[in-house]
Amino acid sequence: MRNQGLGSWPVRRARMSPHATAVRHGGTALTYAELSRRVARLANGLRAAGVRPGDRVAYLGPNHPAYLETLFACGQAGAVFVPLNFRLGVPELDHALADSGASVLIHTPEHAETVAALAAGRLLRVPAGELDAADDEPPDLPVGLDDVCLLMYTSGSTGRPKGAMLTHGNLTWNCVNVLVETDLASDERALVAAPLFHAAALGMVCLPTLLKGGTVILHSAFDPGAVLSAVEQERVTLVFGVPTMYQAIAAHPRWRSADLSSLRTLLCGGAPVPADLASRYLDRGLAFVQGYGMTEAAPGVLVLDRAHVAEKIGSAGVPSFFTDVRLAGPSGEPVPPGEKGEIVVSGPNVMKGYWGRPEATAEVLRDGWFHSGDVATVDGDGYFHVVDRLKDMIISGGENIYPAEVENELYGYPGVEACAVIGVPDPRWGEVGKAVVVPADGSRIDGDELLAWLRTRLAGYKVPKSVEFTDRLPTTGSGKILKGEVRRRFG
């Protein structure tokens, strides 16, 4: 085959295990042979619609087989897949579509109203399943590992979402890392209730499982009771989630009685696993495989395996097998054990750059290393401990919230003179946003009205849960807001 990318995977896997179940969703089950045929029909349909190699094809919808079919079909057609966060508002979706230059948007029925409201002019909007061609012979175009496979949008310190260009090689090497670290098997039954528009659910679970010939069980939304039922009824072997999801499962009334004997692997990312949560699962004979990563690394960077969870609780782990990680000082110099430094990453899983953003790319990719903006220490055994975030990012229930993006919107509200968004502790979500606002002279701002206004402009999880008003914010001599001082005073 001339196609060496992800688009060839369904064809290659169908040759090896055509009758094995690839994907389950609700009452639908697809074998690898069926998945391969469906992917080929969609790839041919995209080509018939005018999609050419390098063109961008977007997808909007919850976890569904159509997501994976569109991803692989883009790979066969040589196109670039653009998964969209269905929790975003219309203005945010418009930005991603315009920035990526997507020519086609495939969507599931529940998002038809949102799709109709989009401003994108020349965009071909197609309900999932309606672009399939009759020909199920897969196109074999020359696609290499260095070609861009997908654009995954991630906000940055500037507050404007950027499309991380992940190549076919980035995603393939990340899968190899996962297979080495977690011992995934061909009889794997992996439950995915976390959204696939995030790099972790896709890169750490779906793709490695499909590469090995296991079964991916998709849930459109997370429900702790449904997860417990699926584990029992489907004999699930692997579950992925963020700490808040695992907390909800452990708090469910059926937690103690549910049969979890089939589970072999619990993958957790997005935030460190609290010690008490790890203990609750250890009491049921279950240990987490924890990870630290980022979209720009497809996403795996550090891994803490089962054998060291109890010994290294709170650690983010050691570098993934084919990934190099070190700590750098302000001038890029190496940092000795025990001292703080910025996490920098190198390896075949690190992105090609940000789509259409050469300056932003140059800021983070320097001398072959990706500069994460996260601060950590390394202990004497080589285990990394993430201690701070240079970018002030808030992690709420596994979702990344960048204050600059929220602050940009706040400044558009009448009467807001200055503002800062910080993260504050929350028993359920780990951390939530709080807006600290300075009203302009003579302005009276109602906090509830301000938050309601934000909900029309941002995804719900990005909207701060509270507002506090103040006469002034602490600043440097040049007028830059001192976020650390804001957190100390108002957090």
From Swiss-Prot:
GO terms for molecular function: (E)-caffeate-CoA ligase activity; 4-coumarate-CoA ligase activity; ATP binding; trans-feruloyl-CoA synthase activity. One of its GO terms (biological process) is vanillin biosynthetic process. Its EC number is 6.2.1.34. ATP binds at residues 291, 295, 374, 391. Optimum temperature is 30 degrees Celsius. Denaturates at 45 degrees Celsius. Retains about 60% of the maximal activity at 16 degrees Celsius. Gene3D superfamilies: 3.30.300.30, N-terminal domain of ligase-like. Activated by Mg(2+). Retains 73.3%, 61.2%, 36%, 22.6% and 4.1% of the maximal activity with Mn(2+), Co(2+), Ni(2+), Zn(2+) and MoO4(2-), respectively. Nearly loss of activity with Cu(2+), Ca(2+), Fe(2+) and WO4(2-). Keywords: ATP-binding, Ligase, Nucleotide-binding. Optimum pH is 7.0. Significant loss of activity at pH 5.0 or under and at pH 11.0 or higher. It is an enzyme of class 6 (ligase). PROSITE patterns: AMP_BINDING. It catalyses: (E)-ferulate + ATP + CoA = (E)-feruloyl-CoA + AMP + diphosphate; (E)-caffeate + ATP + CoA = (E)-caffeoyl-CoA + AMP + diphosphate; (E)-4-coumarate + ATP + CoA = (E)-4-coumaroyl-CoA + AMP + diphosphate. The keyword Ligase applies. The keyword 4Fe-4S does not apply. It holds the Pfam family AMP-binding. InterPro entries: AMP-bd_C, AMP-bd_C_sf, AMP-binding_CS, AMP-dep_synth/lig_dom, ANL_N_sf, ATP-dep_AMP-bd_enzyme. Belongs to the ATP-dependent AMP-binding enzyme family. Catalyzes the formation of (E)-feruloyl-CoA, AMP and diphosphate from (E)-ferulate, CoA and ATP. Active also with caffeate and 4-coumarate. Less active with trans-cinnamic acid. Not active with 3-methoxycinnamic acid or 4-methoxycinnamic acid. Involved in the degradation pathway of lignin-derived aromatic compounds of plant cell walls. Catalyzes the first enzymatic step in the conversion of ferulic acid into high value compound vanillin. This is Feruloyl-CoA synthase.
